[in-house]
A protein has these predicted regions:
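Helix-loop boundary and gating motifs at the non-cytosolic
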Residues: 13-53, 58, 221, 229-239, ...
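Cytoplasmic helix-loop-helix junction between adjacent transmembrane helices
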Residues: 115-153
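C-terminal ends and interior cores of transmembrane alpha-helices
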Residues: 86-105, 285-297
């Protein structure tokens, strides 16, 4: 573990990993808006099929987090991340084959679904592998900083990938876009080849659900945090349009500014003062942002709510993730982090359809009341996490 004694070198190496993850995660982000457009306009299928093609990748990610964590524990973070990037590239190739001119719409859609399922597996394996590898390089005491960097790479890819994906779809067509998504992970694979591996830790393995039993409180907190982000991403523009307010497109911008600003300024805080205190304050800020969105009298108050939501959401994942790392031995770290991330994945996947049903009956503002209540419940879970930690220390 010589790398952990040279923090500047270890940090630079994890920044290089973050850059590779950003480059590779563009494969996910660029496809996100392009896939439903291709399914509906290119294949002539219904909107429901377009939504399924997007959502199936996230379902695959949720279902494979445990397996990805077990790979990271058994094989080491570097090999796990490398496998994830290869799977990314293979998924891009399969989605490229879905654009083959000789295929019927049904056959093309079937091939596309297979590629999207594989993409979800790749996302799961690559992210868990990188977190495990990064913590191995920087040390247990800086696990929160590692997870903050991972989030910056992923959300940065989302911010750039959406418009870039639509631009490439317009200029290159769906096949050309999928070729790019297959090439980017290979570039990331080359970029991380020179970085040193960290040997996996020896120790007795435990069943996945037993590990979940150890970490469910921080997992629930991060999942409840994700409700507000998912609600904002899905319904902010519709909320503004229903009220006749201007600047409907600035909601995610304000969220992103708050999110990135807090990651840059406070990414070190979970390691310095503890994950639970950071999560408690963060979830309180997110709840305030969601309640402000719910009660907003005008567009600028709502935009301020989006900014507060971004500030609040930013550090919950690394803060609660650092608590997870404390609660399991090193040889189970990857499995625990995989299960932990699945809580957030589940929140992202379930919030859209559930909140949509509620919005149909109660209006779009009601969605943000639900987000505020979820963040408040998450705040309570973070408080109980701190109490459990204090009892264990006593």
């Amino acid at each position: 573990m010589h790398d952990t004694t040279r923090p500047d070198l270890a940090y630079r190496r994890v920044v290089a990993l973050t850059a590779a993850l950003f480059l590779s995660y563009l494969s996910v982000a660029m496809a996100l808006p392009a896939v439903p457009v291709h399914v509906v306009q290119g294949l002539g299928l219904d909107n429901a099929y377009g939504g399924l093609a997007v959502g199936i990748a996230f379902l695959s990610t949720i279902l494979t987090r445990g397996r990805a964590g077990a790979w990271a524990d058994r094989l080491g973070g570097k090999l796990c991340m490398q496998r994830g990037l290869v799977i990314y590239a293979a998924a891009g190739v399969i989605c490229l084959l879905a654009s083959w001119p000789g295929l019927t719409a049904g056959a093309s859609y079937t091939v596309l679904i297979l590629g999207r399922l594989l993409l979800g597996l790749g996302e799961s394996v690559a992210m868990v592998g990188m977190i495990s590898w990064g913590i191995g390089l920087m040390g247990h005491a800086r696990s929160g900083q590692v997870m903050a960097l991972v989030g910056m790479g992923m959300y940065g890819a989302f911010a750039l990938g959406g418009p870039l994906g639509l631009m490439l779809l317009d200029r290159l067509g769906f096949g050309g876009l999928m070729a790019v998504t297959a090439a980017l992970p290979l570039a990331g694979l080359v970029a991380i080849h020179w970085l040193p591996a960290v040997a996996p830790q020896a120790g007795k393995r435990e069943p996945f659900w037993r590990i979940i039993g150890r970490i469910w409180r921080p997992g629930a907190a991060v999942g409840l945090q994700g409700v507000g982000f998912a609600a904002l991403g899905a319904f902010f523009s519709l909320y503004f349009l229903s009220r006749g307010w201007p600047h409907a497109g600035l909601g995610l911008t304000c969220f992103g500014v708050g999110f990135v600003l807090m990651r840059l300024l406070g990414g070190h805080l979970p390691d310095r003062i503890g994950g639970a205190p950071v999560a408690i304050v963060s979830l309180a800020v997110e709840a305030c942002g969601q309640y402000l969105l719910w009660m907003a009298p005008g567009p600028y108050a709502a935009l301020a709510g989006a900014l507060l939501t971004g500030l609040g959401c930013s550090l919950v994942f690394p803060a609660m993730g650092s608590e997870v790392v404390k609660q399991v031995p090193p040889h189970l770290r990857g499995t625990a982090l995989g299960g932990f991330a699945a809580f957030q994945d589940l929140a992202y996947g379930a919030t859209g359809p559930v909140a949509g049903i509620l919005a149909d009956s109660w209006g779009y503002s009601f969605v943000f009341l639900i987000g505020g209540l979820a963040a408040t419940l998450g705040l309570w879970m973070a408080i109980t996490t701190r109490r459990v930690e204090g009892d264990a220390a006593a």
